[in-house]
């Protein structure tokens, strides 16, 4: 069952899916509708999950589940991945490529392959102070505190 994101507890589990491109406003409206339907019906072993979503920067899809009410199970996680794969096909984007890095380049959000990001670090086109999106955070609390951080404070630090 859908609940507003801000109503979920801080320890709720999250999954972050960065897009390889910015979504248009029309796409965002459609994605929000799809996410609302998905989270309203998302369940684990027949029990509705208390779930929500966020869209950030017209580029990131964040799914969240209150695991205090009902744990997300393998099958429910599989259904969320299938949902994300459907969005990939529908909008011709990559959302599941974990070998990509998303970071701020001034006011612009850049999305590069890990190889390109390493090269940019070597060439000092990005620095330890570059704001990166740490999409490995696991909870709303971690998301709020450690999602947008300087590269030096994330797994990206190994490149500097």
Segments (PLM) and residue ranges:
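Short histidine/acidic/glycine/proline-rich micro-motifs that form metal-
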Residues: 22, 69-71, 104
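Helix-adjacent hinge/juxtasegments
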Residues: 66-95
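Ordered hydrophobic segments in well-structured contexts
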Residues: 14-18, 60-64, 100-102
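Long, hydrophobic N-terminal alpha-helical segment
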Residues: 3, 10-56
